[in-house]
Amino acid sequence: MLWMSNYNIKEGRMKEYLKFVKDNEKALREHAPKGWKFQGVYCYVLGFGPYHVAELWEISDYADFDAFRNHNDPTWLKLMEQGMEFTTNEPAVAWLLREVGDTKITEPKKKP
């Protein structure tokens, strides 16, 4: 599954935020919660998208969200706190995508 968190960056802080992400990509990967694989941070460009950035993580199952909640690695927590210094106060909007081959579809029965 692909978990995508969308959020905005405070005015005048985008270059600083991008440097923070680039400088800490390795640490984000190495200190991530069990089951979480960092896929990167992407910027919405040319007016496409209602947010400034999207942060993408690959996970295997819903239990990985519990691992995220319970993760207490000091480096991870510090990175999360530092990253939040760049973001605006409105809630981040997240999307969870599942591969087509791993998606279960339920459809109503056809009426006679």
Spans of features found by a protein language model:
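Short amphipathic
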Residues: 4-6, 93-100
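Short, flexible turn/loop "capping" segments at secondary-structure junctions
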Residues: 1, 46-49
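An amphipathic, aromatic/His-enriched active-site/gating alpha helix that lines ligand/cofactor pockets
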Residues: 23-40, 48, 56-97
